[in-house]
Amino acid sequence: MEFSRETRRLALQKMQERDLDLLIIGGGITGAGVALQAAASGLDTGLIEMQDFAQGTSSRSTKLVHGGLRYLKQFDVEVVSDTVSERAVVQQIAPHIPKPDPMLLPVYDEPGSTFSMFRLKVAMDLYDLLAGVSNTPAANKVLTKEEVLKREPDLKQEGLLGGGVYLDFRNNDARLVIENIKRANRDGALIASHVKAEDFLLDDNGKIIGVKARDLLSDQEIIIKAKLVINTTGPWSDEIRQFSHKGQPIHQMRPTKGVHLVVDRQKLPVSQPVYVDTGLNDGRMVFVLPREEKTYFGTTDTDYTGDLEHPQVTQEDVDYLLGVVNNRFPNANVTIDDIESSWAGLRPLLSGNSASDYNGGNSGKVSDDSFDHLVDTVKAYINHEDSREAVEKAIKQVETSTSEKELDPSAVSRGSSFERDENGLFTLAGGKITDYRKMAEGALTGIIQILKEEFGKSFKLINSKTYPVSGGEINPANVDSEIEAYAQLGTLSGLSMDDARYLANLYGSNAPKVFALTRQLTAAEGLSLAETLSLHYAMDYEMALKPTDYFLRRTNHLLFMRDSLDALIDPVINEMAKHFEWSDQERVAQEDDLRRVIADNDLSALKGHQEG
């Protein structure tokens, strides 16, 4: 279904003519998940996003659907259980996006190590049990030092004890957002990017009945009426709530910044994802991950109080991460000049969630008796000497000793909250990408109840565990072969097998729609046929309005295909200018915006400062 600039115009027109059941402010993964479930459940739904979809936070993650193995060190079993369960659901509803990618975790004999070899084995076995992959080909493996080095020969050898391999999943975070958004659009949601909420509309009793917003592309004020409004703006949540609390600061959020750096894989060669202690005795671990022909690594975790729209990578961030990777891969000698791209993102942490870190990890301590009992029970289960029920009982005992006290009953997942202010505004905040569906489900359960109680409207919430996102209509048990079949179809449209396979992986069950564009398109000047199809599909079916939308969020060109990016800039801008009928002034403005983003990402300012 079309999802274009024209779709946006019509959506804004219709939003101003209706009294929506639900208006969503924020088009990251949280808002996208709410929009999908709301529209599919029959609510008259609207969504506005002040930037591009996923631009703020949801495209700036570590790009994993991460199971959180390290939180089993404190036996925070609940968060890991929730995470691996939700990860399995996401794999079911978006099977073309999360892909299994076994993770290597080296263990070193040094102060502050997250795991000993013994604890790693217990944690991995428990993790497999929770993930339902025990006694399958995806089950964990314990590795000797020699086996670790055979897999990753460039790892630091000194102090290396061995390691483990366990199941994890890579993710395309921005694609997950846009596929949720597209499905919501197909189900009738009215959706527009580059529309900023500026204030609430209030009735005589001070209750919210809509939003005053501004179309940032035309600078026109827009009035949108809605029975209920939900704030899903992540780090901006406090700013939205501030509309009704002028002069009264709101500090629900405590954003922290996470930075990732990208280098060529020849500079930092890894054959599989690696998750390793920093070696700085700071209680942190970093990921070193292959993607395309690049390697990226991160992340930092520092409190942030600056510009929420444009968090920057600082020299301190670079020094920290280079120090870690050069310690763990001593022959790499990565310098700032090797960095081809980067990104800085904000984690929307809740300031009151003091017992948990950004992944919901519990900081409570486990008693020796509880730990020993759980270890013995897991061992017995693995040896078929005890039951799963016995393991679950032992887990409950550990949870009791480590759980957060007096958890807010309104929380719909660990590390997240769902609240309603006195003026009627709902705010769904916190959480992590893996939790997005569950968070939306919890929020919609409450919203549907309020719509019935306060407005007399009845809706039945869909079962979102089985409701695929756009592009996700693929058998989750047969993903590779179905993607390959789509790729074969692409070759019949004149694409090379490599290009067809790339597009099939990117678009999933929407790939035939992309290939069908060959009936009306030929390769644009300076672009391959595949690039032309991808660009036009992004403009007409994914509301890509700017070159940065295309290069950074509809595709990963700007992050992981830096070698070929420069040759694509002018042809892509030319094609977009023709498609959107940009003036010369608008074309220059769009190119300037793209060049600024590229300069930020490749750290031109920091590199120039060092040279100076």
UniProtKB/Swiss-Prot annotation:
Assigned EC number: 1.1.3.21
InterPro entries, sorted: DAO_C, DAO_C_sf, FAD-dep_OxRdtase, FAD/NAD-bd_sf, G3P_DH_FAD-dep
Claim: Ribosomal protein is one of the keywords in the record: no
Binding site for FAD: 21-49
Stretch list, region Disordered: 399-418
Name of the protein this chain belongs to: Alpha-glycerophosphate oxidase
Classification of source organism: Bacteria, Bacillati, Bacillota, Bacilli, Lactobacillales
Substrates-to-products reaction catalysed: sn-glycerol 3-phosphate + O2 = dihydroxyacetone phosphate + H2O2
GO cellular component: cytoplasm
Secretion signal, residue range per the UniProt entry: none
UniProt superkingdom: Bacteria
Record family assignment: Belongs to the FAD-dependent glycerol-3-phosphate dehydrogenase family.
Cystine pairings recorded for this chain: none
Requisite cofactors: FAD
Record-linked Gene3D superfamilies: Alpha-glycerophosphate oxidase, cap domain, D-Amino Acid Oxidase, subunit A, domain 2, FAD/NAD(P)-binding domain
